[in-house]
Amino acid sequence: MNDIKNKIFKLLDKVEIDKVDYNDLENLLKTILSEDLDQESIYAFLDLLHFSNVSKLIADNDSNYWALKISDIIKKYNFHTGQLLFQRAKRYKEKPALITIDGENKKIITYNKLWNDLVLCAKSINSISKDKEIKIGVLSANQYKSALIDLCCLSFGYRVIPIPLNSTSEHLSYILNETEINVLFIGGEKAVQLWNAVQKYHNIKIVDINDIRRIKGNSISWEYFQDLGEKNNNINYELNIPIQDMKWTTTIMYTSGSTSNPKGVKFNQIM
């Protein structure tokens, strides 16, 4: 066991008997930021911060300082969405990650299933688009499949643009043109109506999330989209979670202004 892990486990012993010293905690933080350590050690340190007595200790000293330093850890060790979800899947496996609700029916999505679905989506996206820079649009009511696409993009480094369902057809066209979306996921009746109104002005690959089959233009079903991923064995995605530029724009979210053109707000893995 390396020296840093020894320090973490010694600190954990103190945490469990409520004898943790703030200086020990801060010195460990400084070591993590000054050295290059393995990710498992960093996860072990971050786990310490979940204990209520540690959280109180931080709050009693300088919580703003710690918030900034934890942000530095995220950047230094490239803890983007994909890395964190993969770590959670390895740790929690068959424990619930999400619960979907349809009327009175509830469906539990485990961490393993969520991660496997994300990997399949990434394979499918790479198969459907040969563009150098893949830009994903999501025009859909809230549902598991649209959330899956969003998380997949954040995990594997595709830019994603969620489009408000209350957009006008003019605003939809504006967003499609400005962001240069090359794959658009459409889900729900309202989304289909919006797209069909502007389809003739855009040449975009469409994925019919809910298999509505009334979408105009060149569309494929969700099942066919997943089949593309099943046939794509070029990359082992679990061993090739990409290192991402944490400041690169991962998401552009648009306001749905009633008069002027929608405004895009950019987000990266940090904010």
Q: How would you name each of these model-derived features?
A:
Residues 108-112, 250-271:
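Conserved AMP-binding A3 loop
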Residues 55-61, 66-67, 84-109, 128:
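AMP-dependent adenylate-forming
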Residues 93-96, 226, 230-254, 261:
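Conserved pre-ATP/AMP-binding loop-to-beta segment of ANL
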Residues 136, 153, 184, 249, ...:
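Conserved S/T- and glycine-rich ATP-binding loop of Class I adenylate-forming
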Residues 2-83:
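Flexible, non-catalytic linker and terminal segments flanking ANL/adenylate-forming cores
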Residues 150, 167-197:
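Conserved ATP-dependent adenylate/AMP-binding module captured primarily in the ANL superfamily
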Residues 94-129, 134-151, 168-173, 270:
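Conserved AMP-binding/adenylate-forming core of the ANL superfamily
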Residues 157:
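Structured binding elements
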